């Protein structure tokens, strides 16, 4: 007999941050601050300690890019006139500290981010608050990592020239 399907409802909070730079400059700055992950260096590291050391160098601000999608180009020719680039941003050494407790956390790791130009021509960063996603697993060890990711996200927002929200105040309880 199979187990019943589990459904988990949780609160999500989307954060929309105004960035001071024009779209192309903001995107370039983001990609400078969140470099592309070097998976080859990680897979050939030889030990987990060596992976941790490699990632420390690769992710000076805590995050690396695992994917970039140019939304603007894939909707070219449509009525949509937005400029937008989506990213998967994270750190697999941080994610592993949750994965060891529940592999399904990887549905939220890496984090999804979007840089876009709004109708008024202002550049925005959109991202969901990590701690709320990871708190939904009901495991304090996982929730604690979500809080750490909130702090890294706040730092990244500040480095991008945005105003980081007070994420601790936004957590339930």
Give short role names for the model-derived ranges.
Residues 113-115:
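Short beta-strand scaffold segments in enzyme catalytic cores
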Residues 1-108, 117-173:
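Cytosolic covalent-transfer regions centered on His/Cys nucleophiles
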């Amino acid at each position: 007999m199979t187990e019943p399907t589990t459904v988990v409802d949780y609160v999500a909070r989307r954060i929309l941050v105004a960035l001071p730079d024009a779209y192309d400059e903001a995107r370039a700055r983001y990609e400078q601050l969140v470099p592309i992950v070097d998976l080859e260096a990680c897979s050939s590291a030889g030990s987990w300690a060596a992976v941790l050391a490699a990632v420390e160098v690769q992710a000076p601000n805590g995050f690396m890019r695992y994917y970039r999608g140019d939304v603007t180009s894939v909707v070219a020719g449509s009525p949509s006139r937005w400029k937008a680039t989506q990213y998967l941003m994270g750190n697999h050494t941080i994610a592993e500290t949750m994965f060891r407790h529940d592999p399904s956390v990887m549905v939220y790791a890496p984090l999804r981010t979007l840089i876009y130009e709004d109708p008024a021509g202002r550049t925005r960063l959109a991202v969901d608050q990590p701690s709320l996603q990871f708190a939904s697993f009901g495991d304090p060890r996982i929730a604690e990592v979500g809080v750490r990711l909130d702090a890294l996200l706040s730092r990244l927002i500040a480095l991008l020239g945005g105003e980081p929200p007070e994420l601790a105040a936004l957590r339930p309880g």
